[in-house]
Amino acid sequence: MIKPVQTELYAVIGNPVAHSLSPVMMNAAFRSMNVPATYLALQADELPEDLETLARFGFRGLSVTLPHKELAYRLADHVDDMARTIGAVNTLMREGSAWIGCNTDWLGATKALRRVTELEGREALILGAGGAARAVAFGMKREGARVTIANRCVEKGKALAKSFRCDFIPLAILDRARFDRHFDVVVQCTSVGLQGTIPTVLVSDSFFEPGMVVMETVYRPLRTPFLNAAKRAGATIVHGTDMLVYQGVAQLEWWLSRPIPEFPCVAAMKQAIHEVLSKEKNAQDD
């Protein structure tokens, strides 16, 4: 007798969301572990109503991306201690009639950075003051870095800096010729450089130095103008895909209540992303 396959539903929600590599990455992970699940990309414009709709359709878990991470924190029925401290969630799980929230961005960011540098005692600069910046600031402080926030909106940047007891500088100061403060680690946490957005320059090329570690949270395109400028200056660059993978691993561990093995699962996630980005690069070269 034919029986329907029970498939759990997951999705990334945000706006824009068409650029997201999460479906490719997460579906590769599910296949590698023989987990009967499907992961979609869904544009969400009205988050309160959208969460109700997704609950009715039986979605088990959600990845939350721009611009909803702080709102998702406020809408979640319960959040864990880390998310409460950060004030943003990038992960939701349905338990009974409630949405439970946590944050894995900080785990993804710190793991990606620790692969190339120590963070304790380092001077770190975070560009941006949204949900991703909040998570990265939390993670960097937790690792013992001395964190400074730079943001165009002074009020929002100062509020974030106050929350985590960080320094704050207006973003415009970084382009001044006489700005001579040194940073060991720089993390770009805005949507600038995202595929399909209007090109914007955050900092001048002269800001970057040899020996800096520069990480991008945007992952499509793989090499943003921000990362290209850092690379030309001799900095060590960390792609946004590294953070994407490691925060995704933490999401899977939370949703599935099990460890996620490097092989075959994490390797499959990385390979799936690599294949998509390689095809895009080849198409551009043609």
From Swiss-Prot:
| Record key words, sorted | Amino-acid biosynthesis, Aromatic amino acid biosynthesis, NADP, Oxidoreductase
* Involved pathway(s): Metabolic intermediate biosynthesis; chorismate biosynthesis; chorismate from D-erythrose 4-phosphate and phosphoenolpyruvate: step 4/7
Q: Does the keyword Oxidoreductase apply?
A: yes
- Gene name for this UniProt entry: aroE
Provide the active-site residues from the annotation. K69 (proton acceptor)
What's the protein name?
Shikimate dehydrogenase (NADP(+))
Q: Which GO terms describe its biological process?
A: amino acid biosynthetic process; aromatic amino acid family biosynthetic process; chorismate biosynthetic process; shikimate metabolic process
Gene Ontology MF: a single term: shikimate 3-dehydrogenase (NADP+) activity
Q: Which domain of life is it from?
A: Bacteria
Species assigned in the record: Syntrophobacter fumaroxidans (strain DSM 10017 / MPOB)
Task: Give the NCBIfam families listed for this entry.
Answer: aroE
Q: What is its EC number?
A: 1.1.1.25
Q: How does it assemble?
A: Homodimer.
Family recorded in the similarity comment: Belongs to the shikimate dehydrogenase family.
Q: Name one Pfam family in it.
A: Shikimate_DH
Matching InterPro entries: Aminoacid_DH-like_N_sf, NAD(P)-bd_dom_sf, SDH_C, Shikimate_DH, Shikimate_DH-bd_N, Shikimate_DH_fam, Shikm_DH/Glu-tRNA_Rdtase
Note whether Oxidoreductase occurs among the keywords.
yes
Please write the reaction equations for the catalytic activity of this protein: shikimate + NADP(+) = 3-dehydroshikimate + NADPH + H(+)
Binding positions for shikimate?
S20, L21, S22, T65, N90, D105, Y219
Q: Residues that bind NADP(+), according to the entry?
A: D81, G128, A129, G130, G131, A132, T217, G240
